Amino acid sequence: MNDLCTDIGFMSVNKFGEQLCGDHVEVIDQSDDSHVVVLADGLGSGVKASILSTLTSTIISTMVANGMSLESCVDTIAATLPICEVRKVAYSTFTIVRTIDNREAEIIQYDNPKLILLRDGKSFDYPQTETKIDGKTIYKTKIDLHENDFLVFTSDGAIWAGVGTTMNFGWQREEIVEFLEKMVRPDFTAKTVSSLLLDECCRLYGGKPGDDTTVCTVKIRRRKSVNLLFGPPRDPKDVNKMMTLFFAKEGKHIVSGGTTSTLAGEFLGKPVETQLDYLDPDIPPIAKIEGVDLETEGVITMSRVLEYA
């Protein structure tokens, strides 16, 4: 394990009037330091596109999870996916990003918009190797990663944003790069970058997306230690032991749950000061305990955290 980690964030918006998204993102954690991210875009929109993109990303992720090489996954998918008889294009396109030890990345791209790598705030022109598999053109890349690198990749809904309305020919890759170089800061999370770009796509579409649009961002950042204490020990005799171990840990300390907060306050000899400000009426307010970086309610708050994640 090194001092870097991989931050992954993605967001999607459905084509206007559709209930299902024709894009699908699958993430596999091979270890704490190695991850595989697959973004698949099914042809068209609606149920058919959703099934095709889910099938594509699931096949790739399942093969990777079982130790198959990325090349074998690509061979299988490229040979399996049919070509639309009318449009003469694949029924599903995909982008695969695999990070290894948070220090290098393997990128495989098939018919999705070309991945954008932001390094030091500027677009980095990375090398690509072109390969033909069953008549399909696959682009492969293997590069070293640096701290605060952002790998941003999208479905083709992004480059069609605003076509025929706010933009004559859609939002071209060069314009997306210019937008990202202008807006992205090193302290942004992967989810923030994805949200920022997707919001701009929706704005260009006039709030009525003409295609399913997905943005996925992979960021390499330095690790930050956060310790979360949620719930009291089963045996009340273990309270002091648990609190001693918890507060001895390096990094931020978060305590969740009313009973747990009371125990933490007693251990520290500090009162629990409940705040009355509600940022969300559905979420109980936080409290303050001297020596604790953040104190929250338990189950409801943690459920919302998982929802946002």
Can you say where each PLM-predicted feature lies in the sequence?
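Short active-site oxyanion
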Residues: 104, 248-253
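C-terminal catalytic subdomain
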Residues: 160-244, 248-250, 270-309
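Catalytic core of PPM/PP2C metal-dependent serine/threonine phosphatase domains
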Residues: 21, 52-121, 138, 190-218
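Regulatory cytosolic signal-relay segments
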Residues: 1-20
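Conserved beta-strand-loop-short alpha-helix elements that form
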Residues: 33-45, 109, 144-167, 218, ...
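Short active-site loop/helix that positions an aromatic residue
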Residues: 260-270
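Acidic loop->beta-strand submotif enriched in PP2C/PPM serine/threonine phosphatases
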Residues: 18-31, 125-163
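Primarily the active-site beta-strand->alpha-helix module of PP2C/PPM metal-dependent phosphatases
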Residues: 24-78, 152, 164-173
